[in-house]
């Protein structure tokens, strides 16, 4: 039996309004619980279009057929008009998710975090996180205990900023296994649960065809030597590719692969490490990567 942490990122208004209810229904039918990370502020994701001038991002958009994958409402959100606020407009959906799954903060403004957080000072970052946590807690009526940085944009600055909120864990980086990042003070910080497996948009059209993806991913899961964690997106697996996701769950069950919330992957003893800026194939720009230092 192989246990895989299932992380669901919700980046946009449409992903929340349409994708999350579909995913909740699918997960219920398969008796699966997951960790769902919500963006709760304005949907400005269309402002990423300026990145098309970067060849790596343009190629990713072309090979993943982004217009079909996400829809033009997502690709243009917040460009010619102010982005719609996601959280309170979809409060009932978010509350329903929190009844059955582990719910955490993805971002206040996903676009702002992904595009600008690397240049923010620490107080700006703390204020942004606080705004998102406060909004999500108002919606679900209980404390938020986990978070996942938008676009995996995380480094030591992010690690230090999030310590102010005393969360149970964060999932801010890519890596191999849960660990505790060292703080500037030399003490271990809040547990990190890295994503270990590629996402759909990172590999489709580059490493694998869409129709072969599920078999390819299950093979990667079985070969994962660390603690497997897989991320899906409400805008992808909850919308255009929901049938592919259903097929993945069926095939996973047949192969003895089970999915769980990320918190179930935590153990009492975790290695020490750091979150450093790095790059991975299929994703444009830098992102947080795990660097192991020792054990604690």
Curated annotation (Swiss-Prot):
Residues 2-260 form the NodB homology domain. Its EC number is 3.5.1.n3. It catalyses: 4-deoxy-4-formamido-alpha-L-arabinopyranosyl di-trans,octa-cis-undecaprenyl phosphate + H2O = 4-amino-4-deoxy-alpha-L-arabinopyranosyl di-trans,octa-cis-undecaprenyl phosphate + formate. InterPro entries: ArnD, Glyco_hydro/deAcase_b/a-brl, NODB_dom, Polysacc_deacetylase_ArnD. One of its GO terms (biological process) is lipid A biosynthetic process. Transmembrane segments: none annotated. Gene3D superfamilies: Glycoside hydrolase/deacetylase. Pathway: Glycolipid biosynthesis; 4-amino-4-deoxy-alpha-L-arabinose undecaprenyl phosphate biosynthesis; 4-amino-4-deoxy-alpha-L-arabinose undecaprenyl phosphate from UDP-4-deoxy-4-formamido-beta-L-arabinose and undecaprenyl phosphate: step 2/2; Bacterial outer membrane biogenesis; lipopolysaccharide biosynthesis. Keywords: Antibiotic resistance, Hydrolase, Lipid A biosynthesis, Lipid biosynthesis, Lipid metabolism, Lipopolysaccharide biosynthesis. The keyword Lipid biosynthesis applies. One of its GO terms (molecular function) is hydrolase activity, acting on carbon-nitrogen (but not peptide) bonds, in linear amides. One of its GO terms (cellular component) is membrane. SUPFAM superfamilies: Glycoside hydrolase/deacetylase. Belongs to the polysaccharide deacetylase family. ArnD deformylase subfamily. Catalyzes the deformylation of 4-deoxy-4-formamido-L-arabinose-phosphoundecaprenol to 4-amino-4-deoxy-L-arabinose-phosphoundecaprenol. The modified arabinose is attached to lipid A and is required for resistance to polymyxin and cationic antimicrobial peptides. This is Probable 4-deoxy-4-formamido-L-arabinose-phosphoundecaprenol deformylase ArnD. It comes from Escherichia coli O1:K1 / APEC.
């Amino acid at each position: 039996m192989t246990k895989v942490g299932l992380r669901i990122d919700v980046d946009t208004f449409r992903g929340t309004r349409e994708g999350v209810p579909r995913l909740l229904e699918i997960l219920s039918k398969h008796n699966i619980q997951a960790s769902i990370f919500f963006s709760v502020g304005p949907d400005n994701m269309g402002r990423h279009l300026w990145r098309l001038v970067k060849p790596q991002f343009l190629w990713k958009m072309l090979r993943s057929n982004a217009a079909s994958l996400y829809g033009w409402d997502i690709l243009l959100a917040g460009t010619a008009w102010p982005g719609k606020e996601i959280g309170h407009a979809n409060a009932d959906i978010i509350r329903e998710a929190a009844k059955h799954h582990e719910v955490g903060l993805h971002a206040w403004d996903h676009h702002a975090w992904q595009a600008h957080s690397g240049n923010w000072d620490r107080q700006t970052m703390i204020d942004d996180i606080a705004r998102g946590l406060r909004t999500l807690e108002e919606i679900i009526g209980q404390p938020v205990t986990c978070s996942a940085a938008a676009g995996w944009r995380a480094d030591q600055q992010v690690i230090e900023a999030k310590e102010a909120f005393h969360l149970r864990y964060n999932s801010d980086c890519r890596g191999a296994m849960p660990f505790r990042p060292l703080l500037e003070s030399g003490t271990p910080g809040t547990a990190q649960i890295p994503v270990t497996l590629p996402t759909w948009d990172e590999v489709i059209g580059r490493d694998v065809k869409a129709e072969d993806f599920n078999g390819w991913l299950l093979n990667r899961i079985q070969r994962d030597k660390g603690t497997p964690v897989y991320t899906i997106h409400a805008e992808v697996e909850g919308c255009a590719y929901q049938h592919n996701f259903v097929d993945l769950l069926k095939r996973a069950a047949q192969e003895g692969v089970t999915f769980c919330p990320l918190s179930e992957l935590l153990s009492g003893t975790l290695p020490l490490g750091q979150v450093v800026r790095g790059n991975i194939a299929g994703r444009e720009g830098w992102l947080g990567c795990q660097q192991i230092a020792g054990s604690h």
